[in-house]
C-alpha cells in the first residue's frame, strides 16, 4: 500500500481514492500492519470511501492482525451505518477475532453487544430475526 493510498483511505478522500482505483491500484492492498484501505476507512468512519471500495471489489472479509475485519473495526469505532453497509455487502458475520484482549473469539455482533449497540448487534447476528 502506498502512502497516498493509505492517506486517501484514512482521510476520506474519495476523489483521490477513485483516481488511484482507475489507475489500477489493488483495492485489497495491505499496509505494514496487514490492514486494507477498507479497514482503514471503516475504522475512520468514511462511508463514501467504504462504498467506493466495495464497488471496486474490496473484500470485506479480509482480516488484519488478530483476525479483525473491516466490520469489526467499524463496530468498535461506533460507526453503525458503516458496519451495516458492510453486512449488506456480504461481509462474513461469523468471522471471529483472535488473540487480542477483548476481541478473541468474538464476532462483530458480539463486539456490538459488548458496546451496548443492541440494534446493531441484531443486524450483525446471522441468527437474529432482525438481520
Pin down the residues of each PLM region.
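Ankyrin repeat start-site detector
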Residues: 32-33, 65-66, 99-100, 104
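Leucine-rich solenoid repeat scaffolds
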Residues: 93-129
Amino acid at each position: 500500500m502506498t502512502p497516498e493510498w493509505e492517506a486517501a483511505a484514512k482521510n476520506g478522500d474519495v476523489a483521490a481514492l477513485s483516481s488511484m482505483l482507475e489507475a489500477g491500484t489493488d483495492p485489497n492492498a495491505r499496509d505494514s500492519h496487514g490492514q486494507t484501505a477498507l479497514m482503514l476507512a471503516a475504522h475512520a468512519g468514511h462511508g463514501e470511501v467504504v462504498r467506493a471500495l466495495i464497488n471496486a471489489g474490496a473484500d470485506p472479509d479480509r482480516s488484519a492482525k488478530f483476525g479483525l475485519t473491516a466490520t469489526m473495526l467499524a463496530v468498535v469505532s461506533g460507526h453503525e451505518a458503516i458496519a451495516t453497509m458492510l453486512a449488506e455487502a456480504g461481509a462474513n458475520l461469523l468471522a471471529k477475532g483472535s488473540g487480542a484482549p477483548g476481541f478473541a473469539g468474538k464476532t462483530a455482533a458480539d463486539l456490538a453487544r459488548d458496546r451496548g449497540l443492541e440494534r446493531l448487534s441484531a443486524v450483525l447476528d446471522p441468527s437474529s430475526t432482525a438481520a
